[in-house]
């Protein structure tokens, strides 16, 4: 007869990461202005521009690296196209979006493990 006991083995790596970083996530979320009563349209546009300035170069570097682990569905997780679409909303055209400043202090993406770590952080 098969046992119906729940597996009580060691937590998965993902569970350990979530547990180990949960307080940091809470602290970070408290600093983000998304739900601030003071966030106006101009502030939201600047926030989108800042996110684009980070996500566009890091996603480009990730996908150009050729080191993303097999089986990772990038189409479901890429954020840059959505940010571009959202930036069109307040009237920015593609030329203005392409001229936005980009983050140049990117992490090294020279191993599959480094790429996986960055993908984990980007996923939030």
Question: Where does each model-flagged region fall?
Answer:
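Metal- and O2-centered redox machinery and metal/ROS homeostasis
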Residues: 1-124
């Amino acid at each position: 007869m098969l046992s119906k006991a729940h597996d009580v083995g060691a937590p998965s790596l993902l569970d350990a990461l979530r547990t180990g970083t949960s307080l940091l996530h809470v602290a970070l979320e408290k600093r983000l202005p998304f739900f601030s009563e003071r966030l106006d349209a101009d502030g939201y546009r600047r926030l989108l521009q800042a996110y684009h300035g980070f996500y566009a170069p890091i996603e480009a570097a990730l996908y150009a690296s050729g080191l993303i682990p097999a089986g990772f569905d990038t189409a479901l997780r890429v954020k840059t196209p959505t940010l571009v679409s959202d930036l069109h909303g307040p009237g920015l055209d593609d030329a203005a979006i392409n001229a936005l400043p980009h983050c140049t202090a990117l992490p090294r993406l020279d191993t599959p493990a480094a790429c996986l770590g960055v993908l984990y952080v980007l996923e939030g």
